[in-house]
Amino acid sequence: MRLLPDETIEVKSPAQLATMREAGLVTAAALRAAVAAIEPGISTAELDAIAEREIRAAGAIPSFLGYHGFPATICASVNDQIVHGIPSPQQVLRAGDLISVDCGAIVDGWHGDAAVTIRVTPDAATAKSGQRALGTREDGEDPEDEVAGLLDACEGALWHGLAQAVPGHRLGDISHAIEQAARAAGPYGIIREYTGHGIGAQMHMDPPVPNFGRAGRGPVLSAGMTLAIEPMLVLGRAETLLLDDDWTVVTADGSWAAHFEHTVAVTEAGPWVLTSEDGGASGFARLLAGGRVTEASPRSLAAGNGQAALAGAIRTTGTASEGARHGI
């Protein structure tokens, strides 16, 4: 591992990236296990226990548990809770609820971090994201369903941002792509106070990765950098409040929120999504199928080693904004 001068951004060796990939796969498995258990009547504390068992069974360590005093393995944020919700036996899910599950794992000192948001249904496991082309709806699905639209918009914005994680691009290209995708999808509030972040030997590292900003600004990305990219969108205004537990972040107006996250490595072959089982191949394919990419030239989908490249520029325009602070 080395640090780039002036930017203090970790550049990992191939061996370190391989270990981060292991941490990413453990994180992904824990998320899958928790999501598979989601149904009306289950508590968020039960989901937390499922994720912790999955992580420890793999010989890994939960990243979040004890982090600055956080008391759980996952963040479970329901409805108007944006991020950092604390699992509780009293938080029992009901049909129609929206829940974000955020999870991290450590393998040999290296971190993975990912999150997904789903709607709680009688068969909630089949309602999770990733089953259809991004930006499309299934036959019979109400096109006015604002929650479904919110989920599509947030996950789509994530993959637009991930697609910019290639050598030679700037950090602002990621932020800009997320913002433009979100704004194109609908009148959603884009959370500014909480952002993505660098990740590696620590869960939160430089640089912060805002979900808004100008293209062509910020540090130049190079192979070996790793980032946790995590857009947060809301149905209403983007103002937030911190609850008395000093962790849970909610919307000030009570509107519902969505949060998606992946850990990605910048490689010469393109973005390698470390917390995606196939390295990001299916996610980028869905992005293209959804028709949201204005200009893209895929140069590699290296299924053999799990690296997915979506090269070429995804060209968008937008307004400038300021940086923000990062959280889990």
Language model features by range: what are they?
Residues 1-328:
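Active-site neighborhoods and metal-handling regions in enzymes and metal-associated proteins
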